[in-house]
Amino acid sequence: MIEVKNITKSFDGRVVLKDISTTFEDGKTNLIIGRSGSGKTVMIKNIIGLMKPDTGQILYDGRDLITMNKHELNMLRREMGMLFQGSALFDSMTVMENVMFPLDMFSKDSTKERRKRAEFCLERVNLSEAGHLYPSEISGGMMKRAAIARAISLNPKYLFCDEPNSGLDPKTSLLIDDLIHDITVEYNMTTVINTHDMNSVMNIGDNIISKLKENLMVCC
């Protein structure tokens, strides 16, 4: 569970987030909804520790991210999976190599076990036959699924997605929505998604909108 308590963030005197409080539950698909410029990217950057709020607390199962030292923050980030806007795959790597990248960086398992885990993740997103291909050789939807496989490769406790449907057609967007939602439930992750797509709210938002702050809504 992630608890956001009364966070405020300003830039050059302009308040972007003002006294935001909400809770993101385990096993739920939690949505941060807003138009461009509403503050949703700033909010998620604060939640994952890339920015520090001016005031407030961000608690991960009771642990305050804001007061963590560098080592504690690095350990917490190893529990996070990230799905960026676009796919953010490495063009010079195959799909399999992209999925194995975080495993090679952080996993202490043997090479055989790391590859087995990557193969499992690709199978989970229905890309078993695409591991040898490069990003330039697959569709946008397949790249997004490959990015999801990479994001879950380390079996994260928390999954953060920034506009996961960006650039996708409606049919593919629905498939990506369903995949993220199913994986969230399957692994009991705390998933937080930035989106301006109200179709995603209807497709995968687990709970009603519980907080409204100016142009920013949190569905959790």
Name each region found by the language model:
Residues 159-162:
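Catalytic Walker B motif of ABC-type/P-loop ATPase nucleotide-binding domains
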Residues 134-138, 142:
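Conserved ABC ATPase signature
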